[in-house]
Design a protein with these regions (language model features):
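Long, low-complexity, intrinsically disordered segments
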Residues: 281-296
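Pro/Ala/Gly-rich low-complexity, hydrophilic intrinsically disordered segments
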Residues: 1-39, 262-279
């Protein structure tokens, strides 16, 4: 009958789709062609399944061909992707979206994500975080402000450079190992005094002037703006665990080298000889370039 013919056609279409998915699962080359990706696209295959897709700088515009694949990790960094709906329902644990046009993260709901990197995306709504159990969260240069949304996560790495965060209180008692709040309005480090696990801290270009709350911690690396510190500098001088100290304008320094420069007054304007500009022609002052994020 006509109805049976229509049903048969529908069945054939479904089977064709299933066969296509099976082919893609077993053939990374076919998947690359379906995606329209360049040679930068790399895939990890386990058995007959593609389980990881590294599409960084692959020229990708759509993730539709990935629909239905059992992917655990995807890197979409520096691609043209904006729609994540084809990823809904995937068992993703690691998702990198840095420097994409993605704005809506609703398709991530229910995923077992552990690592999520959103640097320089168009995300403004962070309600999707509810119920997530992230261990690594990167929201550099985004309007993220409420740390209460991550309070109950088992985070060990949290990068907030250029975000709207001002208060670190929700992080008190956390198990963070690495925290980056560079170029934020954070001024008080007291909540970190109970974060005994903290090893790497970036507070460069913040409003922090007092380092005394860090007493008792065992930091291994710190990034800071020495010229802004007014109190507690001896707190980190006494920190035997501290191997590297980086400033907002310097490369990595060993702790010993940093203290040599610090004691010479490298970051103390009052100890610098006045410059002779009497004969120098006046030039318009150019605006400073924004500092590149420095992650601990």
């Amino acid at each position: 009958t006509k109805q049976q013919s229509e049903m048969s056609a529908a069945d054939l279409a479904r089977r064709a789709a299933q066969n296509n998915t099976t082919t893609l699962r077993a053939d990374p080359k076919a998947l690359r062609e379906q995606l329209g990706a360049n040679e930068m696209a790399k895939f990890l295959v386990e058995g007959n399944d593609v389980v990881e897709a590294n599409l960084l700088r692959s020229g990708l515009r759509s993730v539709e061909p990935l629909r239905g694949l059992p992917l655990r990790a995807i890197d979409l960094g520096f691609t043209y992707v904006s729609d994540l709906s084809p990823l809904a329902g995937m068992p993703l644990e690691n998702l990198i979206l840095e420097n994409t046009n993605v704005a809506d993260l609703a398709p991530l709901k229910g995923m077992p994500l552990k690592i999520l990197k959103l640097q320089n995306t168009k995300v403004t709504d962070f309600k999707f975080l509810e119920g997530m159990k992230l261990t690594h969260f990167n929201v550099l240069n985004l309007p993220f402000s409420d740390l209460n949304s991550v309070r109950d996560m088992p985070l060990n790495t949290l990068w907030l450079t250029g975000s709207k965060v001002t208060d670190l209180t929700p992080l008190s008692g956390s198990r963070l190992i690495s925290l980056d709040v560079e170029r934020t309005e954070v001024s008080d480090l007291s909540p970190l005094s109970s974060v005994a696990s903290l090893k790497r801290l970036n507070i460069a270009d913040t409003k922090v002037t007092d380092l005394s709350p860090l007493a008792g911690l065992s930091l291994e690396r710190i990034v800071l703006s020495p010229e802004r510190i007014r109190t507690g500098i001896d707190t980190i001088r006494a920190m035997k665990s501290l191997n590297y100290i980086q400033t907002s304008i310097e490369e990595d320094l060993s702790a010993d080298e940093f203290w040599k420069r610090f004691d010479l007054g490298v970051w103390d304007d009052s100890k610098q000889p006045p410059s002779d500009t009497s004969d120098a022609p006046s030039e318009p002052i150019k605006p400073a370039e924004p500092a590149a994020p420095v992650n601990p």
